[in-house]
């Protein structure tokens, strides 16, 4: 079995990462009750004999001694990482695989990318190499970061190029949290656009998630729970927003619940790599099947169910509803409407007590309501993992390469241009060594080119197959 390394960058990246490890440990504990270190758990955890001085002797089989997450934690402030190291998961992280500073990036992409990137490049590379040495077959780096701040956007995208240069054959999956229009970081449009250029050039797959969608989801769940519409039938710990408290404090802040939704997404995304299944999907198959053109590697994700009812018998109707929900606006982790946009490809990653026949039936049922590009009408990729998430009998993660992502990028560009036309706050960036105004113009040109690619695809929508323009090949 292959291994993956999680790289969590900045405050947001580390908080989501911590939630992910908490949930992953609970999942493996529920399945692996004998405490045996097996291939499933080795995909994201090392088994270390803490009695061995130095790096700790890795144990490839037998009883679990001390689990260490295959993770690198990076932040240019100490607060969140220190909180993790004082929390219930403190022993899960290798303290040699942490990089922190005390000054922070000041919500400035240039500081994170240019200053801290140069300053910490060698240390970061050393941590990556060390993580790779502990893997028998390293398949993927998962990067978790936010786009609005300085460290996540700047340093988070700097290390993508480092990974591409050092490990060109290893996939780079990026989970990027996009700021909402009401973001309290006034320079977040600059940071996001500058980061987008790096994502366009150096990521294999990007899962864009916006804060507003996460907030809308938890608001809907809270409304249903508090209004009594769900009665007392919600299964304990089945809410996609719930956590056992990997981080201290902040119990009732919406960001905790929002982070848990993203952690659940990552949990389901990696389930085929961590558990057996009748139709497992390798992580490299996601990029292979869902990304037909290099730059169009942005995948819109949706998660269902958001909670599970306590009755054990699942009527087929409810199972079918799970598939329908995955294509509805309410379950998207990005403000998007995939059903009314154009699909390039779609992956359905199902977990739990679901049959292949259920999967096929629902694809056939939903197909007429979805529009795929003419050259990929059967652009479905499916997986079935037999192990459901804790608290659920079944779940579904849908990943769509769909033109519905375009409005998010257009809105981001508009917010960027509102600032840039006034040259507002530009001096904070230009005073950083290595930062020039051309960095901004190149970044917005890169985004404009990406939007144009989606425009060209949208132009083929509803066009008869025989009228579609043919690919011209230069001779």
Swiss-Prot record:
Keywords: Cytoplasm, Cytoskeleton, GTP-binding, Microtubule, Nucleotide-binding. GTP binds at residues 148-154. One of its GO terms (cellular component) is microtubule. One of its GO terms (biological process) is centrosome cycle. Pfam families: Tubulin, Tubulin_C. GO terms for molecular function: GTP binding; structural constituent of cytoskeleton. It comes from the Eukaryota. It is found in: Cytoplasm, Cytoskeleton, Microtubule organizing center, Centrosome. Found in a complex with TEDC1, TEDC2, TUBE1 and TUBD1. Belongs to the tubulin family. This is Tubulin epsilon chain. It comes from Homo sapiens (Human). The lineage of its organism: Eukaryota, Metazoa, Chordata, Craniata, Vertebrata. The gene is TUBE1.
């Amino acid at each position: 079995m292959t291994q993956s390394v999680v790289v969590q960058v900045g405050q947001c990246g580390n908080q989501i990462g911590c939630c992910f490890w908490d949930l992953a440990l609970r999942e493996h504990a529920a399945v692996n009750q004998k405490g045996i270190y097996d291939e499933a758990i080795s995909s994201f955890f090392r088994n270390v004999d803490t009695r061995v001085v130095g790096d700790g002797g890795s144990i490839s089989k037998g009883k679990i001694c001390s689990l260490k997450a295959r993770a690198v934690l990076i932040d240019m402030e100490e607060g969140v990482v220190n909180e993790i190291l004082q929390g219930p998961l403190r022993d899960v992280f290798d303290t040699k695989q942490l990089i922190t500073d005390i000054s922070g990036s000041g919500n400035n992409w240039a500081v994170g990318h240019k200053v801290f990137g140069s300053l910490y490049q060698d240390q970061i590379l050393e941590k990556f190499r060390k993580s790779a040495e502990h893997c028998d077959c390293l398949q993927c780096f998962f990067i978790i970061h936010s786009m609005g701040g300085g460290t996540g956007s700047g340093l988070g995208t700097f290390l993508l190029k480092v990974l591409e240069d050092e490990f060109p054959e290893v996939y780079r999956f990026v989970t990027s949290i996009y700021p909402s229009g009401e973001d309290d970081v006034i320079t977040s449009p600059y940071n996001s656009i500058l980061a987008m250029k790096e994502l366009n050039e150096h990521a294999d797959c990007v899962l864009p998630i916006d804060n507003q969608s996460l907030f809308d989801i938890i608001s809907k769940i809270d409304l249903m729970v508090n209004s009594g519409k769900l009665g007392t039938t919600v299964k304990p710990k089945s809410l996609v927003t719930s956590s056992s408290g990997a981080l201290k404090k902040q119990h009732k802040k919406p960001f905790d619940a929002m982070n848990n939704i993203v952690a659940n997404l990552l949990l389901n995304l990696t389930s085929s790599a961590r558990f057996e299944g009748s139709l497992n999907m390798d992580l490299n198959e996601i990029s292979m099947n869902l990304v037909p053109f290099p730059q169009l590697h942005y995948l819109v994700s949706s998660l269902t169910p958001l909670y599970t009812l306590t009755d054990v018998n699942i009527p087929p109707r409810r199972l079918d509803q799970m598939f329908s929900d995955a294509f509805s606006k309410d379950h998207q982790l990005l403000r998007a409407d995939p059903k009314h946009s154009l699909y390039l490809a779609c992956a359905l990653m199902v977990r739990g007590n679901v049959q292949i026949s259920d999967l096929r039936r629902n694809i056939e049922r939903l197909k007429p309501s979805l529009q795929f590009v003419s050259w990929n009408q059967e652009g479905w990729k499916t997986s079935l993992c037999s192990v459901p998430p804790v608290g659920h009998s079944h779940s579904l993660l849908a990943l769509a390469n769909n033109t519905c992502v375009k409005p998010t990028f257009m809105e981001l560009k508009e917010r960027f241009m509102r600032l840039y036309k006034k040259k507002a706050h530009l001096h904070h960036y230009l005073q950083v060594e290595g930062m020039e105004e051309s960095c901004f113009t190149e970044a917005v040109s890169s985004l404009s080119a990406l939007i144009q690619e989606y425009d060209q695809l949208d132009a083929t929508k509803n066009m008869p197959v025989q009228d579609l323009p043919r690919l011209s090949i230069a001779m």
